[in-house]
Amino acid sequence: MAETQTLKAEAREKGSKGAVRSLRRAGRVPAVIYGDKQSPELIAVSYKDVSALYQTGTFMSHVLDVEIGGKTERVIPRDVQFEPVRDFIIHVDFLRLGKNATVTVDVPVHFHNHEASPGIKAGGVLNIVRHEVELVCPADAIPEQLDIDLTGFEMGSSIHISAVKLPAKVSPTITDRDFTIATIAAPAAVVSADNEAKTEEAGEDKSEEKSSGKED
């Protein structure tokens, strides 16, 4: 599980568009904390701080402690809005997490021991179907990543979610099938040559059938 980061914030009043623009010009980002059967709380956070967290690539799947004055709210980011032209953050929605809360998050998949896969050693290619897997997790036990060991996987193998060891109380949102995360595929050149060979064999078989028919 990832270490919980702290984000400092300040309370703000609901204001006009002009007030919000002034806030942004001062290097602050308007945000809101909602959920857990409590009233929404309007806050402002440092653009520099929230941008640095966002650029880690795992912002949306990490629990944060937001410090507002003398209190701390445990939250997880749920939406980030960007300025459409200059592509900088202009608003963030945080979901407040109560005790024993569960969350749905996208967790990245990491592959290990490529050199121990007979399929890859033979020239196969790791074809990643899902770079992330959507999981339901306790808010205090979100996996940093899912690790898949490629040892022993042959050419043509498929790696399914059942091959991944998930932490306790963590489950995929897709439960009606053993979905594929990756495959060990033959390189295009090998596939092309194999298809050509099959086409030639099929053609030869048809020619032999025609010849047999004429002899009859």
Swiss-Prot record:
Keywords: Ribonucleoprotein, Ribosomal protein, RNA-binding, rRNA-binding. The gene is rplY. Residues 195-216 have a biased composition (Basic and acidic residues). GO terms for cellular component: cytosolic large ribosomal subunit. This is Large ribosomal subunit protein bL25. This is one of the proteins that binds to the 5S RNA in the ribosome where it forms part of the central protuberance. It comes from the Bacteria. PANTHER family: RIBOSOMAL PROTEIN L25/GLN-TRNA SYNTHETASE, ANTI-CODON-BINDING DOMAIN-CONTAINING PROTEIN (PTHR33284), RIBOSOMAL PROTEIN L25_GLN-TRNA SYNTHETASE, ANTI-CODON-BINDING DOMAIN-CONTAINING PROTEIN (PTHR33284:SF1). InterPro entries: Rbsml_bL25/Gln-tRNA_synth_N, Ribosomal_bL25/Gln-tRNA_synth, Ribosomal_bL25_b-dom, Ribosomal_bL25_C, Ribosomal_bL25_long, Ribosomal_L25_dom, Ribosomal_uL5_bac-type. The keyword Nucleotidyltransferase does not apply. Pfam families: Ribosomal_L25p, Ribosomal_TL5_C. GO terms for biological process: translation.
